[in-house]
Amino acid sequence: LRLASWNVNSLKVRLPQVLDWLESAKIDALVMQETKTTDDVFPQAAFAEAGFDVFFLGQKTYNGVALCSRQTTVKTSDVVLGLPGWPDPQKRFISALLSPLAAPEQPPIRFCGGYFPNGQAVGSSKYLYKLDWIAVLERTLKTYLADTPRLVLGGDFNIAPADADVSNPEAWRGKILCSEPERKALERLFALGLYDSFRLFTQPAERFSWWDYRQSGFERNHGLRIDL
């Protein structure tokens, strides 16, 4: 199966690009972050017309996650909306079991999508919420892995795993997205048996997923790799 993750930054704006890319890249299942749409107006019909089942958990203006799977290649079951056992008004997590229709004898994959909190600033209440959120996610993944060893977690992690994922490491040292507690929390997720799939292969230097548009970051390639 070809699995992918995309911070769409408003599905209302990005829907044509998402549908085009799902087809051109032959994606079997996709987790989306920052859909920024409430469930009552989610474009479910557009995904169905394109041949996808879609599941979603949204809110107005902020956050929101979704998971879609291709009907001809994937059987989707046991959809979970939100982090189990942790009521949170912010809609940030979704997961489901995926079974490839071409190989029904294979065990299913637990496909998870997360929109990690940004944290705003080191030491702030939003930063503490971020660390708490990741701790709950860690417990959730432990439970999942006990039942389903084949697990994929994708999303906007809002953490640069290492200095190699930052265009100017010294400028970001100790700051939000790069602070030591954030990276340690991410390392604990890897310690569960997960791998950063991007780093399993030789990559060119300075490959990032986020740039600050206010400082012409994209044009200058001054960015961070915070989407895993």
Task: Describe every region a protein language model picked out.
Residues 46-50, 133-226:
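Metal-dependent phosphoesterases centered on the DNase I-like endonuclease/exonuclease/phosphatase
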